[in-house]
Each structure stands twice: as structure tokens, then as C-alpha cells.
Amino acid sequence: MNMRLRSLWREWASPIVFALLLTQFGATAVGVDGASMMPALRHGEHLLLPTAEGWAHRLGLGGYRRGDIVVFKPPRGAEYEWRSDYRGVPLPWRYRPYLVKRVVGVPGDTIRIRAGQVSVNGQPLPEKETQAYWNTFCADTTSAPANSVAASPSRMNLPSVTVPPHSYFVMGDNRSPGGSLDSRAFGPVDVRDISARAVVSVWPLIRKASATPPCDGGPQPEERVTFSGHEEWNPRLLLP
């Protein structure tokens, strides 16, 4: 019996435990699902996360910086973000899916959005590439959601919000109509809900140089992006 247990541990349990420890306290990879981080990230990209760093931040050691791309779960109070299916397959439970967004505000920052322009502590957010990309296609600068800094529709007229301790204000790079559901809707995200920072895009290896998004605010925009241009090497560091 002991021999069987040792064999089971060596052949099955040990690799599984090692994999769990590696992904929880080492590094793991996640896929980008959707178009909310265009143009920086495209649907189907796979990102590498140093999960050990995420654990350190949750324990109060260091923190995320403005511009970091993070993977997190939306706040528990954001009921509309809870899911009961996975890729169309019904599940007997509800869960909060992981999202990928960019850190815009860190604890203590004051966030204000006017005419689509994000300001942090009174200074315009430096995002020239993002603004240039969406101004070329379909930047949303007028809708209430695009200019909200509140956690509920009834508070959308708040002129600004101060990020609480141990929390972060996150936004998607997609500034088209309905392009990203983020802290403009559900408010700042507690550090305990942030898994880690994405540091590298590792897949696919090759991609088309240009991506043209749909601008109708319709569902599943990631399925309607048009790719063109030459092929280029995709793996790259994700710098703030």
C-alpha cells in the first residue's frame, strides 16, 4: 500500500502540487478575452504574470504603479460582472471573471474625467498613443459612462474621486463607445482582488501590424476587429 501511495505521489500528486505552487507563488499565464485593452492588447493574446509579486503587494510589500497592466477580479458589489457560464456553457455556480485593465490611479490619487480626458491629481494622464489611436477611429468623449468616476449610475455626476487606501483605479485602453467596463462603472479595485501585473505578452508569436476596431458599440467587438498590414513579431515586454 505504501508503495502504491509513493507511486501515486511521484507520478500524479507531486507534479500537480508543484504546478499549483508554481502558478500561485511563481508565475502564470492568462489569456486576453475581449477588446477592452486595444490597442495595447488584442483578443487572444497570452500574458505572463509574476504571481509572487502579486502576493507581496497584497501583504503590503510595495505596490502597483500608474500604467501597469493588471489582472484582477471586479469588486464583489459589481453584480453585473458576476458570471454563471463559461464561454456559453452554463455553470451551477456564479463567479467573478478575471479582467485585464491598466492602473490609472494609485492610493491617494484624485481622478477626474472631462470630455474623455482623464486627469490624475490635476494633471492630464499621459496616453498619447492611446488617444491618437482612438481619435483616428471612434473616441467616446461625450457619453456619461465615458466621463464617470463613480461606482454606480446614480453617482455619475461626481466631478472627481479619490482612490482609497489599498485600492487602484483601473481603466481599459479602449475609449470607443462601450469599449471598456472598468472603475468608471464599478469604482476602485481593492489590492486583494488583484492577481498580479502582466509583464510580457508571450503569444501569439506573429501578428498583423494594424488592427481596426468596430465603432458601433455592439456586442463582441473582438470578433469584428479587422487586421491588416505586414506581419510582425508579437512577444514583447509590457512597460507602463
Regions found by a protein language model. Give the residues of each.
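Soluble "head" domains of membrane/secretory-pathway proteins
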Residues: N2-R10, F25-G31, P39-P240
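Hydrophobic alpha-helical membrane-embedded or membrane-associated segments
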Residues: E11, P15-A19
